[in-house]
Every structure is written in C-alpha cells, then in structure tokens.
Amino acid sequence: MHATRKTGEMPAHWPQYGLAAVIALVISAGLHLVSCGKTSGGVPQPTPAQPQPGATPPNAVLTFHNDNARSGQNLTETTLTPGNVKASSFGKLFVIATDGKVDAQPLYLPNVNTPSHGTHNILYVASEHGTVYGLDADTGSTLWKISTLLSGEKPSDDRNCSQVTPEIGVTATPVIDPAAGPHGTIYVAAMSKDGAGNYHQRLHALDVTTGAEQFGGPKEVQASFPGQGAGSSGGTVVFSPGQYEERAGLLLVDGIVYTAWTSHCDHGPYTGWVIGYDQNTLAQVSVLNVTPNGSEGAIWMAGCGPAADASGNIYLLDANGVFDSSLDARGFPGKGDFGNAFLKISTANKQLAVADYFEMFNQAAENGSDQDLGSGGALVLPDFNDSTGKARHLAVGAGKDGNIYVVDRDALGGFNPNSNNIYQQVSGALSGSVFSMPAYFNNTLYYGAVSDRIKAFAISQARLATAPSSRTSHSFPYPGATPSISANGTSSAILWAAENDDPAVLHAYDATNLATELYNSSQAPDSRDELSEGNKFIVPTVVNGKVYVGTINGVGVFGLLK
C-alpha cells in the first residue's frame, strides 16, 4: 500500500443474572447453533459461534465488529425495529464531545457498577488525542477519562502522512474482557511522542470502572524477529515505534491480546508485525513478522481487527510487499515473506506462526499496480454444508481489485503461478476497491466498496451468490462502508452504515431488502440529526436501542425520540 496508494487510503462488578439474562448472554456470545431456523442445503445454518473474551454480558460490544469472527451483528436488539427506525420517531439524541478524532469503534458494557457513580451502561470511546473515556451511554455524561500520555508527552504528530492527521493517539479499536482484573479490563494501544522527540507505542490495560492502569501497565511495545529484511541489523529485524501505527482493531484470544501493525504512508523501512501480550501480565508472549527477509507487507485492513475462528486461528489480509515465489517443500515462501496475502496464523501454545496462506497467482502484477488485498478486512463465516453435505469452514476477504475471495480455512490455497487455487472467487462482484469489511447475517454477506452501493450476497450450499440479491440505491464514497447489523434473533434486521462525508451521514436499511432505506440522518428538517464531518473508517455501534457514530470531534448518539 504506497503513500496515496498502499495505505488503506485513497488518491463482583457484574450483577447476578437470572435465567432470562443467561439466555441473553448465550445469544450475545454468538452461540445460536441451529436455532436460527434458516436452512441451506437442507441443514440449519448457524450464525457464527465465536470465542468471546471472558463472560459476555447481555447487550455488550466488547471488540471490533461485535465478535472475533468480525461478523458485525448484534442479535439481541429488541428496541430498534424496521417499524420505528424512521425520521418521525428516530433521530439524533445528543453528541458527546471529545478532545480529538474518534477513529476507533466505540465499545459498550451494560450495568457496570462503578465505585463513585453507581451502576451505569458505559460507552468506551478513545480519541486520537490519546484520551480514553468511560461515558454514561444513555446520557453522555463523563464517568471517567484518562490520558494514555505519560508525563511530558503529547500525541504523535502525523509523521508527514495525511492518513491520520493532525495527531495520532488511539487509532485502533480496543478490546474488553469483563472478567479480567478486579472489575473488568479494556485494552488500548496508544502512540505518543516525548519531549526528546522519541516515539512510543504502548499497550494499556485499564479498569473498566475507573480507567486506572492494571497489571503494571502500560507496556512499551518492543519487538525483534530473525531476518534480514528492511530495517534489519545483524540478522535481526527490529520494531521501531516511530515507523508503525496500530490501526487494526485489537484481538483477544485465549488470554492473549494481539496487535497488528502498519506503517505511516509507506515511509520505509517497515515490515509486517503481529505481536501478542498476556492479558493478565502484559508480558510479551509471541512475535511474528510476515516479511522478515523482505519489506512492506503491513497490516492495514482499514482499521478492521484480525478475525479468529473457534480454534484460535487468526485470519488477516496484509498489504503490498515482498512475496517469495520460490516455494519450499511445504509450498510456503522460501524466505518466509508473505506480502499481499490472505493469512491463517496459528496461536497454538500461545505462539504465532503462519499455518496457511493464499497468494494471488498474479501477485507481482497486483503488487506493482497497488491492487493488494490488505486494504480490506477478513471475516470468518459460520460453517455451511455444501451440495454433498460436507461441512465447509470458510473465511472471506476482498481488497482493491473488486473481487471477493472465499477461502477454505482448512486449505487456503497457497500460491500457484497459473491460477488461484481457492474455494471460490467472485470476480467483479464489487464496483470499487474495498477499504472496509463485510457484515454477515442469516446466510447473507453484505459488502460496501468504494463508490459502490452496499450489496447483499446470499450464501447457499456453502457458495456465495455471484450477483447481489439486493443493493442500496445510494452509493458510498471513499472509503465505502463497513456495515453493522442489528436484529432480534433472525427478525427485525437492520443494516446500518456510516457515510464518510461532511457532514457524516448515518443510514439504516431493511437488511432483508437493501432497496428499502428506513432512515438517514439527512432526512429530518432543519438539520435536526446532522453530524459533524466523518472519519474514513467509521463503524456504527448498535446496542440496547441506540446507535453510536464516531466523528472528527465526538460521538453522535441516535435512538428513539421522546
């Protein structure tokens, strides 16, 4: 991903729950299994049953795009329905001001018992000024806020790069484990600059009730890896904090917080890093470099978090970079360089290792023309039975070439110089590049590419339809849209999408027919619901009857009007 090209850029604290709440907890964790009722190939099809950090309270949003599969669906929304989401009854309730841009997706915990303010539903918001807020999600009042900056520090400057500007503090969506520490913990990656001009990347672990640092944090991000690639010395590649940014959302799997790193406008030298930290000690437990003997291969993914399956394998798309087309006996790049690839990364024994990969057959041409996969995010699909009755374990991703790539998680496809040996490729399905990721709901995949209409692709017998079943009438400018889904089980499904414009626009569509727009924030008279300017990678958070939308100076809160 180069300057304007390779970037992902364009030119005792939880109450005791009764039986009903336990059922809701199971639903919110994604454990629907065969209860959804819709079938494919004669077999009931599940919504994703993905591991969630800790014990997930009902109506919680703990991680980017709702779960580790990155499905983007909240299936416990009982307040907002296609019948009441309309300009006459739904709109902007208030705006929460922040001290910087809000690029990270807001997260949400219900019924949090705080030591000083009683019990609240709390919205967690992080700004590019390096501030993390614990806010009353229903009123917007500040319960606590902390700065991730140490004494004498300020947020990082933009590193002569217009991607995140004018300052860089917290870009990546944090992750919450409500069972970690005495009251629950939110993990935050933040960048800063000290008085001597040195740059710092740190992992913070904050108490969800007070914002206090936990586990001896923050932890300075430092790493090295064997290799002779860009920026190496003496056979070792070293992580230089000023060269990198944590844009991808954090991922929590089996007690390890994973970070994945990108560059600033492709200012070299840089390579592709994934680094894991013990969630209870912040000790670094594993490091992987995906281009250790080459260069580039950064992990942008438009702010999307790496996905994970139920076995803890991580799936991500990395950007333009060196790929070794001379393969070893396993069919892997001989020097371990996986630029511009769809990667499956094992976390067995809490150690990171590339377990499988898919590389486009024309990777050299795609790399040279900046048509890499790394601009978009990966999504782990639930299991589907194919036409023979065989269970298929699939993941999906798309990048700048407008194709949708569906991979078999048991055999991604590797590299063949003559053709793409993958499970399914839907060519030309999208009318623009993807700087976002899809959402999944009820056997349907929703994609919003650049300057394209959001499209719904049905999944039947473990195959993705080659043409959309419905699409929005409105096209979304750069960077397109990462949709979110709210539903009550399989009913009352709404697709939400934020349009990056000035002002930003929140859209709501009937998820069963995207031609039906239920609402947008430009419809009400007298600019009643108008937002401020949008950010590139806004992802609406929809939970407990409200929709939270980040902007350049705060969070817009939408809900039913009184």
Language-model region placement:
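N-terminal secretory signal peptides that target proteins for export/translocation
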Residues: 1-14
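Bacterial N-terminal signal peptides
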Residues: 20-32
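Bacterial Sec-dependent N-terminal signal peptides
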Residues: 29-56
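Mobile, glycine-rich extracellular loop/lid and propeptide segments
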Residues: 57-346, 352-384, 392-414, 435-457, ...
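Substrate-binding/specificity loop regions of serine endopeptidase catalytic domains
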Residues: 413-423, 465, 558
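Inter-blade linker and blade-boundary elements of WD-repeat/beta-propeller domains
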Residues: 418-430, 468-472
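A beta-strand-loop signature enriched in Asp, Gly, Thr, and Trp
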Residues: 455-486
